Each structure stands twice: as structure tokens, then as C-alpha cells.
Amino acid sequence: MTTETAEKVEYIIETKDVDLFYGSKQALQKIALNIKKNQVTALIGPSGCGKSTFLRTLNRMNDLIPNVKTTGEIHIGGENVQDPKIDMVNLRKKVGMVFQQANPFPFSIYDNVAYGPRMHGIKDKKVLDEIVERSLRQAALWEEVHDRLDRSAIGMSGGQQQRLCIARVLAVKPDVILMDEPTSALDPISTAKVEDLILELKKDYTIVIVTHNMQQASRISDETAFFLNGRIVEFADTTSIFTNPAEKETEDYISGRFG
């Protein structure tokens, strides 16, 4: 009996038979994926395969797109994400998201990080100061910006802006952080900083990352799901996926035969 089996695996995200349609076009087919707590799970696959669409089902961002229909079961922390009565503000607090392009608000660095806590009712300046410092430290940004918190976030470098967006997510203490190609617009040095940050953050958070960069997936993830044509072809520990894939389609993609 493995240690993992003996200790019983804790899944924070559980999905079953998830289908998604954009109008009449089916984008996801019977997706069943259980994601472990405090791990990094990578979603890989060619463009248009459904990986970003699936990521957005986890905090219902697809609801913002006209004519989208999602069916199946999605539970996060035991809560039914598909429940029509769910508190969407609370869901997106619990399940934060970092996008491909850094999207800082046109505010000061301080106000970017304090925005979420203020939205959730925190007004005390001392408490906000503590949250801002903690979040910027967690995002490995405090030492770079602590003496210019009142300056506009728009003047930061691209890599700093992306880490600021991560700090903004951390400020509301999510359980899960979704990342959609978070380093694709960054230079190699900034990418390395974000990757180091992801590895540090998984001690306290569960991270699901969409990436086209297979080397990145192999460096930072514990498990990897390979998507193709709206379905999951293979889901396994990352080492197995990249060194001994069970499916020929996975092997063909990993080896660069298509995609």
C-alpha cells in the first residue's frame, strides 16, 4: 500500500461528465478530472483543445460569454460550483484567476492589492496595510516596490505587473489559483521568477495552470492533463506523462509530431 493510498488523497477539485457548448459547438466532452490539494496541475494541449475553456468552468468565467451552456458536476472544496444559487462573488474569491496578459488596475500598487479586501468589506487602514505587505511578500514583489506603493501600477515592468496580479489574487486568501498562460508574454527572467513563485505558493494553495510550454509544465507541475479536441486524453503524474505516456496521442504531442 502506498503512502498516498494509506493517507487517503484529498481532492479539492472534483469534476465529472463536464460538457460545454458555445451555441451548437461542443468545446468540452465528458471531462472528469480530480485535482489534489496543494499541488500544481498543468493543462496542456494544442490551441483550441479546450484547456482554457475547462479552466474557466472552475470559477464560472464562461458564464460571461453569450450562449454558453455547461453541464456535468463541478465541486470545489465540496461546494457545487454549478448550483444556480451559488454566490458568484464568493466563488471568485475562493477560486482566483491570473490571466495571460497582466491586467493591473489603473491605480497605485497599494490600491491594486487592497482592492479585493475593500470589496469584501475591509476598511481599517492598519489591516489593509498588513494585507498589502503580506500579499506582496507572498508574490515576491515587496522588496522591489515597498518604497513606491503610491505609484501607478501601469509603470511597472511586465513581470512585475504579473506578480502584482498574483498578489491581488492572494490578498483575498483563495483556496485555488487558476493561471491561464501566465508567463507567455514574459521574458525568460520574469518567467523564471513566476515559476519559482508558483512552486513556493503551492505550500498554501492549489494551482491549476494552462500552458503551451511543455518544458514549463515539466518543471513546475505535479500532475498533467493532456487535452485534445475537447476531451482529456491522459491525466497522470507529470514525470509519467513526459517520460512514459500511456497514449499514442500524448506521445505524438509531447514529441512534437503535432500541435
UniProtKB/Swiss-Prot annotation:
What broad class describes the main subcellular location of this protein?
membrane
Swiss-Prot/TrEMBL catalytic activity? phosphate(out) + ATP + H2O = ADP + 2 phosphate(in) + H(+)
Q: What InterPro entries has UniProt attached to this entry? A: AAA+_ATPase (IPR003593), ABC_transporter-like_ATP-bd (IPR003439), ABC_transporter-like_CS (IPR017871), P-loop_NTPase (IPR027417), PstB-like (IPR005670)
Please give, as recorded in its UniProt entry, the membrane topology of this protein: Peripheral membrane protein
* E.C. number: 7.3.2.1
- Domain ABC transporter spans what residues? 13-254
Q: Which Gene3D superfamilies match?
A: P-loop containing nucleotide triphosphate hydrolases
Q: Kindly list the GO molecular function terms attached to this UniProt entry.
A: ATP binding; ATP hydrolysis activity; ATPase-coupled phosphate ion transmembrane transporter activity
Q: May I have one GO cellular component term?
A: plasma membrane
Binding-site positions, ATP: G45, P46, S47, G48, C49, G50, K51, S52
Where in the sequence is the signal peptide annotated? Answer: none
Task: Tell me the keywords, alphabetical order.
Answer: ATP-binding, Cell membrane, Membrane, Nucleotide-binding, Phosphate transport, Translocase, Transport
Superkingdom of source: Bacteria
Q: Which Pfam families match?
A: ABC_tran
- Compartments in which it is found: Cell membrane
Q: Per the UniProt entry, what is one GO biological process? A: phosphate ion transmembrane transport
What does the record note on quaternary structure? The complex is composed of two ATP-binding proteins (PstB), two transmembrane proteins (PstC and PstA) and a solute-binding protein (PstS).
Which family does the entry's similarity section mention?
Belongs to the ABC transporter superfamily. Phosphate importer (TC 3.A.1.7) family.
Described by its record, this protein's role is as follows: Part of the ABC transporter complex PstSACB involved in phosphate import. Responsible for energy coupling to the transport system.
What is this protein's name?
Answer: Phosphate import ATP-binding protein PstB 1
Which gene specifies this protein's sequence?
pstB1
